Structures are given as C-alpha cells and as structure tokens.
C-alpha cells in the first residue's frame, strides 16, 4: 500500500492514528492482515489469554504493532444439539479492556465479536467520541440457535454500532437481518497469511494408495467427521481404494478412531493438530481436501487448500462456500446419499481446482480496513504529540 496516499501528502504532519484492536487471542492466520494494518496505523493489540484447545499454535509476533495481554477469565462452554455435545467454545471476560482504553486513548477501536468486549469498546467510543468497528463472522447458519440473552446483547450492539466489518458475503447476510444498513458494512474476506503457502515445502506424507483424501480440523461433532467416515466406508465397500488422513485434536478424537475401526476403514491415518506453519507440507501431500462442517463462520482450511493448489469439496454450511466455490464443489454433509456421491467424485479426481483469484490477500484485506479507518479518523485527529501512558509495551504474542 502507498502509505503517503493513504494518510495524506505529508505524513510527518499527520501521524498515524492509534487504533486499539480488541481480540480474544492473536490468531496465526491473522498475522498477515495485522502486519498490513500496522504499516498504516499505530496498532495496539489488546488480547486475552491462550485457549487451551489452541496450545499447538506457535508464538505470534506482529511486526510494527504493540500489544498487551489483558487479565481476565475464560469459561469453557459446550454447544449441544439433540442432547449431544456438538462443539466447544470459550467465553472471554476481561474487564481490563476498560482501563486500557481509558489510559491509552486510542483514536479508534476495532473489536471482533458482539459481546462484553464490544460493549466496552462502544462505551469508550461514545464517551470519547471515537469511531468503533465491529469485525464480525457469524452467519445465518452459525447463529440460528442463539439464546435469549445473546440475542438481546446483539440487538443492543446492532443499534449502537455504526461501523461494521464482515468476514464475507454470508456474514453480511446475517448482519442485514439485524437491521444494520448495508452501507455501514465493510465486506472484506476472511483470509490467511498466504506467504506460508507460497514458499516451497516438501510433502509431509508419502502414502499409498492414492488419492490421499485430507481433512483438517478439530475432532468435534460439528465438523462432520463421523459423516465423512461413514461416506468413506461406503465407497470402500464399492471397491474404491484411497487413503484418508485426518489432522486435528479434540474431545471426540478417541470416539472417531473407534468409529473408523467399527466401520473397518482401510488406509486411514489420524494425526494430532499441527502448528500452522507445518500445514503447507500436509496440504502438498493431499489430492483433495474434504471440508464437511455442519456449521462454520468461514473455514480457513479451504483458503489454505486453495493456496496449496488442492481441490476442495466444501460443505454448504461453511461461510466461505458460496464465495469461493462453484456449485459442483459444494455439498450437504447432512444428506448421506449426497455426501457419498460428492466424495465419489472427489476420489475419482472429478473436482476442478479452486480458483485462486477468488481469494483476497492479507494485503488487500489489511488495506481495505486501514483505508476505511484512516478516512474516519482524518477529521478527528490532532497534530499534537501524543502523551503515552506510563506503561511498558509488550511484544504482540498469542500466549
């Protein structure tokens, strides 16, 4: 990005606005976007602690940004469907955001959910007349069973917040149902740091028989892995031969391995979750990625496979599906017959390679957000030197 064009003809007279980014944790996939934001903005990342199901994530440092971990609590919650555990998530409660915003006096705030953290950001923006963006990823599918209290909070946030950033088309559709005007929504695209996948990498696996069918994701019911195993078993009963590799950890890992044994699946391999930068070698081992999620706000594994040149069979319930894939690559994992037919096409090599041009790079997404923030901050900014709070800035890390 041409920073002079973004912040004016004389950047020495117009310093970067300080922008506080409020997040649960610093996700490795966001590293590229955050780096680009930090080139145009004085970026301060305020984050909570590492979630215990993400311990395989490596330390993340965002060049050009400062950051601080906010003390607080994490509540581990289980989402249930039809009386059974469907997924697990963490509720973050970090009251320290209030103090950090008041002391740091950022020129703008970006927050990535519709809960406590966003209410704090909106309160700060209202009291100090600063713009606040809510960065949102939920879809009509993922939010279909939101409870009464969360619906109430979202009504408050939807009326209060005037600026929004959405993960993509399906997230925008959900925001519109909350009564948020389309002109208030900056639609970007959820993305990964593509530089990891552009670098050469030797395949991590050399398995036979081919093709190698890959699944990457947490071992929980909501990811559709049991449905994948049943569909694979039916194809093997038809006489098709292929290898299946599943990469990930989760509370259902033992249960799924037991199911694979009960189905008498051949050539199936389970691998524990890998550090993000190790994943390009796994994608380069694969002939096709199967993404059978029952609900996902986006599905960054699809981006990763596309960048690796691997065809993708994608669930219709993934937020990324209509934006990244043609209809022949999209299926309903809840329909067993449709799943079997789609997986048969994938195993026979009948899926087209996804179009990389549909992906937005981390630079494009970072520039879209930065330019929007700069445009809103320009009339408000002062050329007086900023007085920094008497605190020590930490490196921005994920734990």
List each language-model region with its residue ranges:
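Short hydrophobic beta-strand element within catalytic cores of glycosyltransferases
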Residues: 311-315
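Aromatic "clamp/platform" in nucleotide-sugar-dependent glycosyltransferases that forms part
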Residues: 294
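A conserved mid-protein helix/loop that constitutes part of the nucleotide-sugar donor-binding site
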Residues: 32, 211, 215-234, 240, ...
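Conserved acidic donor-binding segment of nucleotide-sugar-dependent glycosyltransferases
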Residues: 326-337, 344-349
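A short, histidine- and acid-enriched strand-loop-helix "catalytic/donor-clamping" loop
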Residues: 130-148, 160-163
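Donor nucleotide-sugar binding/catalytic pocket of nucleotide-sugar-dependent glycosyltransferases
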Residues: 154, 159-200
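Nucleotide-activated donor-binding/catalytic signature segment of Leloir-type glycosyltransferases, i.e.
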Residues: 16, 257-273
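Short alpha-helical donor nucleotide-sugar binding micro-motif in glycosyltransferases
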Residues: 273-274, 281-286
